[in-house]
């Protein structure tokens, strides 16, 4: 969030949209990622984002990445603690199961 705040012009609006941390406890979006405790702070190794959308020959050449999945409160508090003015927080249904959150969007001003 520090980098986004530094890059955004004063008076500008940040729109952050990402997978909902709820996906930590179940692979509800079929992202081929391991499930873990919602509150886990573990770092794990996996494929780059969206690698599964490439052909296997390309996918195998992509470097592995380290991930740490944050809780929704960690994400929202990072927005607030980095001087953004939180304007809106929305949760969106998962693609395959509209009964659970799959993505979120945060809108905040600098």
Where are these regions (language model features)?
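C-terminal lobe and adjacent flexible extensions of AdoMet/dcAdoMet transferase-like proteins
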Residues: 74-110
């Amino acid at each position: 969030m520090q980098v986004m705040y530094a890059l955004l012009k004063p008076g500008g609006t940040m729109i952050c949209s990402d997978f909902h941390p709820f996906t930590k406890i179940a692979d509800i979006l079929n992202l081929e990622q391991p499930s873990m405790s919602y509150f886990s702070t573990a770092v794990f190794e996996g494929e780059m984002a969206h690698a599964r959308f490439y052909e296997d020959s390309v996918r195998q050449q992509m470097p592995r990445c380290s991930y740490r999945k944050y809780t929704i409160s960690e994400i929202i508090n990072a927005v607030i603690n980095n001087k953004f003015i939180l304007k809106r927080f929305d949760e969106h249904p998962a693609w395959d199961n509209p009964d659970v959150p799959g993505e979120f969007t945060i809108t905040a001003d600098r």
